Amino acid sequence: ATKPDCRGQGIFTQMLNLLNETAKKQGMQGLYGRGVTFHTFSQKTGNTCGYRDCAITLCVLPADRVYKGMGIPKDRISTVYSYLPLVRHEKAAIYPPRHHSAFIEGIYNNLSIDMISLPCDEKNIQLQQQSSFKVDILPNVNMADIKLYAYGRDAIDKLMETMKMLLKRKIDGISLYLDLGQPATAIFCSEFEKLGFFIAGAIPLLYFRNTLILQYLNNISPDYSEIRVYSDFARSMLEYIRERDPNRDL
């Protein structure tokens, strides 16, 4: 936390700008940040320094965190992913799920990255015999991350088996990261949503060159009135996500 007598001097903004310049000199292609939604200060600073919002992950942090001068959150805390391109990105050639195509295109427009939606022929998708997953359990926040590296014929069954294991451990939520560069993502997304996953957003260079983020909440109904976002685009994303959240009426 910043000392009260040091606040309002733009120190955080200066530090973030220095970080951005250092990363650019080191040849990095982009940076991403995650601002909590208990307040909008970090989101605002990120936007001021050129970061643009691209995903909202709900209830990913425990509610026991204390924010000086702002109290303790009532519920688990959500975060806003934002991304800053440090170089000119080549056009993103991706396979977005058809029902989220406009939403994902809006995200890339917000990031000022050109994209093209590639057609996907479900009948000609090549699947491996077995899927390749990586599961990371995050005990400090009681969450889990799943990265799906390769789609196999067992993708649905393997994901269901993994979910069963995680829910048995009473994990509060799961983030599922999918490769938008794989045609199978366009097809399997809706199948994963039938299991209770729903959209969070999309971001470049996180696990994959272009990543689709889905999320799953374990019997948690977010209080959307307590989720504070700074940018107009984040507000439109939040409404889109809320409309597709199967937990909103729990």
Tell what function each PLM region has:
Residues 95-126, 227-250:
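Short, cationic low-complexity segments
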Residues 105-200, 205:
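Non-catalytic interaction/regulatory modules that flank or connect domains
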Residues 32-34, 50-72, 198-210:
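Conserved catalytic-core motifs of GNAT/GCN5-like acyltransferases
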Residues 33-43, 52, 60-61, 176-185:
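Conserved beta-strand-loop-alpha-helix junction that forms the acyl-donor binding cleft
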Residues 23-36, 169-179:
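Conserved GNAT acetyl-CoA-binding A-motif
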